[in-house]
């Protein structure tokens, strides 16, 4: 078991270096190409300008290819029979609501630059298409990269030509980073998702349910009113698959929404303890929920301190605009730090985030959970 854990850790550490290695190669290739331009002796200031232009070019190319990548999911998803649900680039999100209208909202998820969510088609022979939808982003990055490569070959070693080469290189790099199966920043990439879905019928069903739950949320359906069979907790063995483990997370979320806190906490503690396929951000999310449960329950200082690890604080800082994380921060300020002034500022942040949050029904649930914090604080004052 220990040897297996060491092997998995080495593999994880190596894969975490892959994106950096790919972009180091992009930088080296761009430097070689730029050196071919006949521009005389640039001098120190020329080199500084070159470096600044290169950094700016990389950012522009990444931004462009994030859009291309998510558009690829959309295009290949539509070709596979999927229906549009939401489209996000960084924190800018367009989502179809309960009336069928597409509205602009804001939401960011740590570890992701974008996301295109779609409603899967009905099963055919017990299966749904998953490869084109999941890998469509990488496919379109490659197509765009090849187009830029053709333009570079036509223009040669000119400034414009080399700029096109940079866009080609970043396109291919984006395709590789998303297509080579690995976990990035606590999130499974597209290639990893395809492998996870393909491992079992249960994993494929879990993938369908995830998309259906998110689509229902966008239509204003309360998670407690969705079909109960969607939230049946998979076995420990099944949850070794990341797709199935996500259903366990949804199950925990449903229990919390239903204010069954003790039941939810027991399940979350179990999921965090067993060997599972839980992705990093879901682990941190469950810890957030457990912190809340502890605060409104026994409120033991040593237990809360243990859960508020450096890693957990880092996650909460990265997700500081997420309404659930804001609610947890509010609970910490009121029930752990006893700092009402800080709590008021956090509550103002919640109201600001709520204005652009894509799922109105989640705002209602979060407000109710905040009220429970206030009730607990009031009881503490009386005592």
Residue ranges and their predicted role:
Residues 79, 115-124, 182-263, 269-275, ...:
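Polar-ligand-bearing catalytic/cofactor-coordination segments
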Residues 253, 257, 278-322:
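Alpha-helical adaptor scaffolds
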Residues 121-218:
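Hydrophobic transmembrane alpha-helical segments that form the core helix bundle
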Residues 238-246, 282-289, 321-324, 328:
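Start-of-helix signal in alpha-solenoid helical-repeat scaffolds, especially tetratricopeptide repeats
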Residues 250, 289-293, 324-335, 366-376:
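"A position-specific structural signal for the A-helix of alpha-solenoid helical repeats
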Residues 2-58, 109:
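Topogenic membrane-insertion module of multi-pass membrane proteins
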Residues 57-121:
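Small-residue-rich helix-interface/hinge motifs
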Residues 225-236, 261-274, 298-316, 338-353, ...:
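Alpha-helical repeat scaffolds
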């Amino acid at each position: 078991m220990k040897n297996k854990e060491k092997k998995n850790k080495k593999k994880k550490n190596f894969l975490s270096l892959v994106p950096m290695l790919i972009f180091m190669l992009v930088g080296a290739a761009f430097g070689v190409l730029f050196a071919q331009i006949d521009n005389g002796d640039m001098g120190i200031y020329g080199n500084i300008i070159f470096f600044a232009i290169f950094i700016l070019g990389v950012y522009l190319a990444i931004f462009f290819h994030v859009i291309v990548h998510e558009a690829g999911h959309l295009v290949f998803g539509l070709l596979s029979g999927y229906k549009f649900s939401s489209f996000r680039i960084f924190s800018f999100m367009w989502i179809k609501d309960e009336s069928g209208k597409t509205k602009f909202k804001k939401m960011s998820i740590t570890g992701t630059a974008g996301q295109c969510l779609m409603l899967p088609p009905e099963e055919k022979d017990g299966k749904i298409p998953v490869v084109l939808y999941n890998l469509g982003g990488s496919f379109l990055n490659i197509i765009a990269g090849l187009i830029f490569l053709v333009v570079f070959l036509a223009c040669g070693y000119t400034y414009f030509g080399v700029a096109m080469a940079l866009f080609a290189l970043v396109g291919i790099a984006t395709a590789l980073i998303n297509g080579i199966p690995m976990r990035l920043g606590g999130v499974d990439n597209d290639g990893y998702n395809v492998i996870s879905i393909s491992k079992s019928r249960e994993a494929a069903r879990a993938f369908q349910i995830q998309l259906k739950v998110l689509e229902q949320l966008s239509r204003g359906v309360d998670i407690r009113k969705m079909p109960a069979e969607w939230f049946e907790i998979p076995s420990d063995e099944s949850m070794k698959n990341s797709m199935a483990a996500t259903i366990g997370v949804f199950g925990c979320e449903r229990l919390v929404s239903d204010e069954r806190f003790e039941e939810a906490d027991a399940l979350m503690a179990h999921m965090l303890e067993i060997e599972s396929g839980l992705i990093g951000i879901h682990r941190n999310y469950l810890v957030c929920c457990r912190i809340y449960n502890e605060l409104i329950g026994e409120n033991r200082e040593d237990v809360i301190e243990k859960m508020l690890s450096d890693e957990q604080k880092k996650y909460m800082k990265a997700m500081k605009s997420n309404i659930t994380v804001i609610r947890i921060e509010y609970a910490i300020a009121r029930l752990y730090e006893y700092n009402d002034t800080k709590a008021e500022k956090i509550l103002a942040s919640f109201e600001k985030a709520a204005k652009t949050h894509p799922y109105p029904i989640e705002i209602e649930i979060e407000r109710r959970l905040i009220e429970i914090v206030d009730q607990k604080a009031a009881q503490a004052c009386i005592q």
